[in-house]
A protein has these predicted regions:
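Phosphate-binding site recognition
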Residues: 1-153
Length: 153
């Protein structure tokens, strides 16, 4: 990190984005777009070793697809903390690197090396996001990654 961010503030933001970690219900629209089924199929395919990127204009439902995927995974009895949603356009999270955010997640929420699903919303706000995601795909097979982006992703 360029300067020391308050770890507890970052954890509070992450916990706010992931109410299922505390056993709280999700409020997600029932209508599912075509992209939902395609994302689920790829995430569940053990041979698929890439990140999935949903790109498109704002307000078309990309975030809803991410949250619906989380809801489906949680209904499948995965460990709730193994599913992490991070909105990278949050003012505080924009100050940290994606690597730092995932390190905090692994150190404070869910142990390193265990399988996890990363739901990265508005990924274009993370500096050098392409390199971070490529590194995660290449060196962390325990991660399944679904990211969204707007504008020039």
């Amino acid at each position: 990190m360029a300067f020391e961010l308050d770890r507890s503030q970052i954890l509070n933001v992450l916990r706010g984005f992931n109410p299922w970690w505390a056993g709280l219900p999700m409020n997600v629209p029932a209508f599912r777009r075509l992209a939902f089924d395609q994302c689920v199929r790829l995430l569940e395919d053990p041979k698929f070793k890439r990140a999935i990127l949903l790109s498109g204009p704002r307000r078309v439902g990309k975030t809803t697809v991410l949250k619906q995927v989380a809801e489906l995974l949680l209904a499948g009895r995965v460990e709730p903390v193994s599913v992490v949603y991070i909105s990278l356009d949050h003012p505080l999270l924009k100050l940290a690197s994606l690597t730092d955010l995932l390190r905090i997640y692994r150190e404070d929420i869910f142990a390193e090396g265990k399988p996890a699903v990363l739901l990265l919303d508005e990924v274009q706000y993370a500096e050098d996001w392409e390199l971070h995601v490529k590194t995660l795909v290449d060196h962390h097979p325990e991660y399944r990654i679904l990211a969204t982006g707007s504008a020039a992703v």
